[in-house]
């Protein structure tokens, strides 16, 4: 996701993080701000663009070597790659965020990475190798020539919300939380975190990746990439996918909160 999506995931998470876990996370991040997660949600994207952080680029995705739209699947052993991927990163930083042998800066970095990568995993094209996760599928959206990946990351969410400031993300998150509390998502939400376990991070994160990857076949490109390259994706394609984008952002926030709560719970138990 782009800045709007990541901040919205973080604001949804902030709603569901327990007060005790919130204090713990604020202590790690050195922030008592009301946007303590949202304000750092895109740090990992900024970091990977620096010379010091370019090593981390592969951690933002897993390249599922499948065959959409005919076949979508994630295989951790097949797809993760020697330089790591989102799944291995979530496992690594889940361990590092509370490793007492590491520095407070290591802990803060780990939490910043977790906030970002758990969000990225719900963007279907971050769980897909085809055309570099859709980056090489050139399309037109609302009159602009861009690529399918950036439309999913940034331009379609911004079209829905109308901006990308923290205040826009906070407003969107409130709507998504309402849907979780008493709306379209209420019956689904417990299923989003079913079986999630910080002691089994590879298994858990692979399930998250598989959940989003399946949408590449059913929602993102159900008729293949070529079908998206004629005409403008707005409004017909946009209308067909925007509900899924909202659902995936909500899932990311709900899962992130549960993950933080579980990590904090294991800290207390030590």
UniProtKB/Swiss-Prot annotation:
Cofactor mode of binding and number, as noted: Binds 3 divalent metal cations.
Binding annotation for a divalent metal cation 2: 15, 126, 149, 153
Primary localization class, coarse: secreted
Binding site for a divalent metal cation 1: 45, 60, 116, 120
Descriptive protein name: Nuclease PA3
EC number, as in UniProt: 3.1.3.6
UniProt-annotated site: Important for catalytic activity, residues: 45, 48
One Pfam short name: S1-P1_nuclease
Binding positions (a divalent metal cation 3): 1, 6, 120
Principal EC category: hydrolase
Family per similarity comment: Belongs to the nuclease type I family.
Gene Ontology biological process terms in this record: DNA catabolic process
Keywords (A to Z) from UniProt: Disulfide bond, Endonuclease, Glycoprotein, Hydrolase, Metal-binding, Nuclease, Secreted, Zinc
Residue positions the entry lists as glycosylated: 92, 138, 184, 197
Chain residues that bind substrate: 1-6, 45-51, 60-63, 73-78, 92
Keyword Glycoprotein: yes
Subcellular location field: Secreted
PANTHER family listed in its UniProt record: ENDONUCLEASE 4
Residue pairs linked by disulfide bridges in the UniProt entry: 72-217, 80-85
Cofactor(s), by name: Zn(2+)
